[in-house]
């Protein structure tokens, strides 16, 4: 979805700043049109690698300084699909500073209800406005510090 598109934009910006970014499409490579556009922009970026979900565990063992999670966004509700839950479990055990985009995957942005495998962020960037879940006890536990970013939406 567009949360993944946001992650792709961040990967591009990081690569432009000479960071190496590894991108994993957890739920497959069927992307929204906007996310697909951002994926195509990365095709010629030397600083971005696309890795398969089955490669992630090994890569995490080598260590990352920063983990940015953008699997699901504000549209999530219910239980996490097993592929996403498995990745969240790996990420939650990994080293590195963890950032969630808008809302951690597994956290319902309206109710604050959290899947047992919800991504645990050190920092969450809320786009445009805080969501109700950011103010709940579960939201505070899974979001870490939450910072609202003005993205030009009024």
Where is each model-derived feature located?
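Nucleotide and nucleotide-moiety/phosphate-recognizing core
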Residues: 2-71, 79-101
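YjeF_N-associated NAD(P)HX repair module
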Residues: 64-154
